[in-house]
Amino acid sequence: AYAGNLAVTTTSGPGLSLKSEAMGLAVMAELPLVVVDVQRGGPSTGLPTKTEQSDLNQALFGRNGECPMAVIAAHSPAHCFDAAFQAAKIALEHMTPVMLLSEGFLGNGSEPWKIPSMKDYPEIKPPFVQGILPEGEKFRPFERDPETLVRRWALPGQRGFEHRVGGLEKNHAGVLSTDPANHALMVAERAEKVARIARDLPVLTMQHGPASGALLVVGWGGTFGHILTAVREIGAAVTESSLIIRHP
């Protein structure tokens, strides 16, 4: 990712724990990374061939320090493609690692799927630096876009944009800093940057039932089909039931 490309890795089970340090580094360095976690029964080696949704809390919170990440969950075998595209777009445009949750049920599942045309998908626009710096001006790698709080992405070898990244805290100029006030500022900016990703997400839509009613069922991930079936079956008894699938 430091060299100017999206970094992607996949894992399952305790492999996610082993990658937590690298994810923290990507959060601190603010570089695009997608981690795909095909969840299985745990803990430890657990049930390698059986499905589970037990990694959600680790995906949301399983890193040291204040280390927020975007998390997306696929809900069907076909949806894995769109979820992966969304994860890549978020990572590249917001300069952040993203966790994509799948699970054994989806990994071993199948369904008819029409291969899409990429022209039907929105353009991905990474925040690469453009042009050259004015004479005497130094590149400040952690200065942010005022709307998105995303930093600019300078590639190694770009003249005038030399800078350092790494796991140590830095200020906006990219200089190492242990100043408490600067640390508080950078922690807050990184968290708010991730929170503002929600501005670019589509509005949630009702998958079944009326837009309002007495009962709302919320689910996530591969339980989508089961929940949808259950809501449809109880629809005769609970006429105001609705289903919405929320991607964390």
Predicted regions, residues:
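Thiamine diphosphate
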Residues: A1-F61, A70-A91, A236
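Short capping/connector residues at structural and topological boundaries
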Residues: E21, F61-N64, S110-E111, M118
